């Protein structure tokens, strides 16, 4: 969210994750819930040196340069103790050690699949980098949540190539169809908000059979 938020106006929310994850794991254990935590590969790094070593060599050349996190790497601290805003290695270890949940991919560092300037190949490199650092931590990644719900059907073949066999899509309505930053508008956001309370677009639940038939 760094292109839209700052530590000054959003930092409290980020630090809140340090409390939220343990609380969620405790509740999941209590009620027998199994969850998927889709995580950027960035957060698998234990320190900045490891992070830099794992970054994909090929990076997206977004038309809007502010979308690229690499322009702000000088602001990243050394490790989680030094910079809890950018690192969360201990939280991932808590999820992993719980043994009841899946850790999925959110790409390496919030890859935006509908923004101008990026390509299928840079997307593939982001997924491979995320898979590699996850594997170094003993985790096999099989699922993906597209950052900002920028679902791009043309990229599903890339997902298959790197071992992703399931993904979170968007509800079948124009309100939820993937859009890039410039194509999003307040009207759609307002209708999505209203849909939360008024069910404007119908139910979006699916049977197990439907889900299984849609796997990559």
Pin down the residues of each PLM region.
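Catalytic alpha-helical scaffold of carbohydrate-active enzymes acting on polysaccharides/glycoconjugates
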Residues: 1-143, 148-215
